[in-house]
Amino acid sequence: MANESAVILRSDRVSGKMEMRKNLLLQHIYRSGSIGRLELGRDLQMSKSRLCEVVQEMIDEGLILESLDGTERRGRRPVPLSPNPDHGCFVGLDFEAKRMRVVVVDFSGKTLFQRHQELRPMKDQKRLISRLLGFVDKGIDAARKLGAHILGVGVAAPGVINQTTGTLVHYDFIEAARNTPLRELVENHTGHPCVVDNNIRCYALTEWTYGAAKN
């Protein structure tokens, strides 16, 4: 039994390291848009054998694509790696004091659907929750009509966020938002995993990934 437990623990550690490597590669591929194996390995200081192992698993899982860039060069042409847009999609809700926005983006980050709506000040938490979840539904419905597999829901919320619980703790400009368990509410309502973070951090991450800050 002890030997079996040790094998399981080692297996879990190996699996955890692989997931970390895949996340690291995927993040770098997102920031690059499209990048060859050689450059990727050099940037991340990863051995060729390790890189090939991780990349192949990501291709097999449908996370990334590998395709010829079509340029004419001597010798073997580079084969860029890029996120696979058909792997699935994410529904995103972004709101603040006076407005809210819902988007659907594919796995490569391309916007497939977007809607804006006014959000009026309110003191009733149940009413606020109903408005927010109803707007999330618009994104869910749009994704389903597109035939896209929904991987999860992201919420960019204003104010103080408890990232551990996904709770909006406090926001000065929406009284009804105090101690709203956004992650729990969204997951129970949609049946999809949800991540909640402060909207300013989300904007900064987007700029770091796709904007001028990536350089």
Residue ranges of predicted features:
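Short helix-capping/turn signature of helix-turn-helix
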Residues: 31-32, 108, 174, 210
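Gly/Thr-rich phosphate-binding beta-strand-loop-beta motif of the actin/hexokinase/Hsp70
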Residues: 77-114
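Short beta-strand(s) of the beta-wing in winged-helix/HTH DNA-binding folds
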Residues: 36, 65-66, 71, 162
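Glycine-rich phosphate-binding loop and adjoining helix at the ATP-binding site
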Residues: 116-215
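Conserved phosphate-binding catalytic cores of ATP/NTP-utilizing and phosphoryl-transfer enzymes
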Residues: 66-90, 194-215
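Extreme N-terminal segment that seeds HTH/winged-HTH DNA-binding domains in transcriptional regulators
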Residues: 1-42
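Basic amphipathic alpha-helical segments that dock to polyanions
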Residues: 29, 40, 51-64
